[in-house]
Amino acid sequence: MLPLQGFNMTYPRKGVMPYPSTFLYREEPSVSTTECCCCWLCRLLCCCSTVDSQTALRDRMNASQPPPGGGGRLPDEVYRKIKAVDQGQSTLTQSGIQGLSARTLDENQRGDLVFQLVEIIKKPGQSLGLYLREGNGKDRSDGVFVSRFGDNSELAKSFLMSIDDVVLILSIPRRLLLRIRFSKSMRHEVITSRSSERPVVVFHKYDDRRDSETNAPILSQPTSTANTWLGKKSRQQMEEMRNATTTSTMRAAHASTSSPRNHFAPRLVNGHSQPIGVPSASSASTSDHHYQRFASEPSDSVSRTARVPPPRLASATVRRTESFNSAPGVSSSAPMYTLPRSSTAVPPPDIIGSIPHSARDPLMRSDLPYDPLTGRLSSSVPTDPLLSRSLCSPILPRTLRQPNDSNKSNSLPRRRIMTGGRNVKWRNDVVSTSDLCGEESDGAISAPEYSSPPFSRLTQQQQFRLSNGSPGRTVNDIFSAAEYRNWAGPYDPRGMYGPYPPGQRTTRWSHTYGEQRAPRTSSLPGRTVLAQSLVGSPVLPRHPPPIVQDRPSAVFDRYHVSPLMNRRAPLRAAGPGINVDRLSVSSLTGILYVHILEGRGLKIPEKQKGLTEEMYCVLEVDEQHRARTGVSTIEQKFKWRETFHIDVVNATVSNFFVYSWHPQFRHKLCHKGSLKLLEAFVVDQLNDDRVFALNLEPRGQLIVRIGFHDLQAVFRRTVNPRLNGVFGVPLGRLVQRERRDTPIVLTRLIQEIEKRGVDLSGLYVLCGSVEKKKMLRAQLESNPLGTDLNAENIPDTNVIACLIKDFLRELPEPLISPQIHGMLLEAATVALPNDVQANRTLVLKIIDCLQLSAKNCLLLVLDHLSTILCSSPHNGLTPTRLSLIFAPLLFFCLDAISPYTTSPTSKMAAVRSLDMNQASSSLQMILSIWPSRVNSESGSDSPATSGQKGGGGVSYVSESQC
């Protein structure tokens, strides 16, 4: 074929589509139709041509007008026929055919060359998938050749065109007219070679296991991986290896049939235990039928791929080797040979030495001959060099494989389970092999032919050549961090091995990505290929036995430095101190420190702008109202600057609400936001604080500082070093210094609350401001008797209630010691449900065993709690809720040396010093039998206290004297 001689182009008026243009080419007898693998694509001519493209082609070709006769060696009648057909109406269009249609209008033959005039009609916007190029890429730089067809090309399905057809005339845009030329013998050879290919394996085993979905061909359904470079490269390697293996297998079969050793050589069998190649009475008549049936089956998508390059491969049927490893009713003592899945895992030459140790099982030894001289299995199976040196690999029978399939070929993409990934940046230089070669459930069925460790080794060249021949570009540059993280998430083995063994640590991310199993993205390669491309180390076992020991958290997890899903927390620089291990608790129990700094971007609703400009913030923990700030205005920039110490039990979520305030009108909700407490403390673990910019709805942000101290940090029970202090001083020293039965501070605070009324809603639940509490505490430390506690000076009753809890919490020793607590637990086991008086006497006798100072304070507190329970319908404090508040204050103390037991011979369990449920149950038992308080003017020998302010006081006497 010679270059373009001329073209005829008619330009219409402005705004009108051009008439079909005709490109005329001159032909010569000898045409090379061979295409080089490294061809370049000239342009895609599947849509309507434009004036710009025609002008560019005209300038590049520098062509002239064609001669009147049609030009070149093309006959004039052919040119006139093409022009007439182009200007006429299409019969395909008149027939109303939808979609793309193609037909041959004219065909003639000159010797070995065939000329065809092809008409193609397509609907608007449809791509034909036809690629043309200049030159054949080998010895011709001019002329137009059909380079290749795209994926799912309509032209390829019509079978009217083929690769390397020479385009003589191209007419567009109304309909596509192609005058093509091809060699009849060349196309016949291509068709013959395609039809002569046969399946490698003729035995098909059906498996009815539960994981049949994963047993299906990996690429049986088109996925996103099929369109990626890695997927095409993998299928290309499979096709090359299949061609090489077919030749080697045919040679080996010929050698084995002609050799006397063929009685012992491994053979392929069919479904009726008949060796292939040995005809039988039942199979001889149907052998041709089976042979043709397998040849006509639709090919898998593994082999139906466009080579990169060449663009198109012949179709063939490649079955999964899992389906051919054994046959029913056939002894599986001899290994069978079949096609490996890919060239990334070629077995070593020594096959006999790779039999796993499971073959030495006494139940299996009878299947293989045993050599008494060598003490090993007899090696009567020949090691034919054609078999051992080829690309065929042995498939050991299922009974001879290792139960722990630790190394599997993982060169092809797999469908795996995933969840929604986190969009967190990750680094390529911090990923180790141990983090990548994790457990994966599909390994046992992905490539069962490679069950021994040497079978799944990648070569050094393959480890770093996972891109277009570039050793420097790895999978890191191909796939995103989110896809990699979803793929690399360690598999949660609890579904296979049960729950985690005791003491084994699990990371927060492994629980998130490994427990829930959902379809995995198919745009990633197998775990083995990606791991070796990143690290360059041998493949590690994918199913290691569970080890009961603490393991460090995944390295790439340490660099996920944002603790929140929606980025409420600022990112912190990664360092050795960052630890994002999943917290060992599912909720928080202790003291929650919340510092509400200010609000940003807050706006009052339009309806209330004329009424008020003041707003306040409300804090809820697990949907319970726990704190409230004062009011602030927009002139103050909504800077509240208030701190709250909230005692929480099994807290998980905190909610923030911003209300507008008005003394007469109803308060309106303006903004709201929520924060998961466990996510807030995941970076630095517990017992620390950090600042968050909490996003509010519908707009604005709330700047808060949140900290937490667990029970071990709260109830250390240390002594106040101040000699004249009041809080944190041993109780005996304090009452001795003050010469009172009970501490003055505790007595005055309780009296003030009862004076204001115990029916206040949220009493001991709402928290007062820490700033106001510190001011009142400083006054009580300096002058316990002279401090003014009236409502004018301290309007917030919650501040006084918080000081009572602080006083009991900071005592060096709890009011109820662990020994007395153990006695109460034992009394609960012997208490009679119907004898209230006997139970009361027993409990009071146990309390009488306390020290005098502790007993007097306990009586004061219990009488106060009993009074609060009398107003339970008003204040909302039930015995259970009140016990959860005061049980830690009365019972808890940190004792890490040894737990207290009830008695040396007691059958009761040890007293757990920080057990909330145990302490709450004990306090509920005491409150259930505690007598109501009676005011008495007369004196008594009761150890109950009489608190005094100035010269007067009120005496509290219990009915039952201790």
Swiss-Prot record:
Disordered: region residues: 231-367, 397-419, 437-471, 934-962
InterPro entries named among the record's database cross-references: C2_dom, C2_domain_sf, Rho-GAP_regulator, Rho_GTPase_activation_prot, RhoGAP_dom
Domain Rho-GAP: 729-923
GO MF annotations, alphabetized: GTPase activator activity
Keyword vocabulary terms for this entry: Developmental protein, Differentiation, GTPase activation, Neurogenesis, Synapse
Pfam families (alphabetical): C2_SYDE (PF25336), RhoGAP (PF00620)
GO biological process, one term: cell differentiation
Gene Ontology CC entries for this record: synapse; synaptic membrane
SMART domains according to UniProt: C2 (SM00239), RhoGAP (SM00324)
PROSITE patterns in alphabetical order: C2, RHOGAP
Xref: Gene3D superfamilies: C2 domain, Rho GTPase activation protein
Site-annotated residues for Arginine finger: V765
Domain C2, chain residue ranges per copy: 572-696
Subcellular location: Synapse
Record field: compositional bias (Polar residues): 243-261, 323-345, 401-412, 453-471, 934-947
Function: Probable GTPase activator for the Rho-type GTPases by converting them to an inactive GDP-bound state. Regulates the localization and assembly of presynaptic components during presynaptic development and is required for specifying the identity of axons during initial polarity acquisition. In these roles it is thought to act cell autonomously downstream of syg-1 and syg-2 and upstream of syd-2, possibly as a positive regulator of the latter. Required for the control of movement, egg-laying and the correct localization of elks-1.
Protein name according to UniProt: Rho GTPase-activating protein syd-1
Lineage, top ranks: Eukaryota, Metazoa, Ecdysozoa, Nematoda, Chromadorea
Name of the gene this protein is made from: syd-1
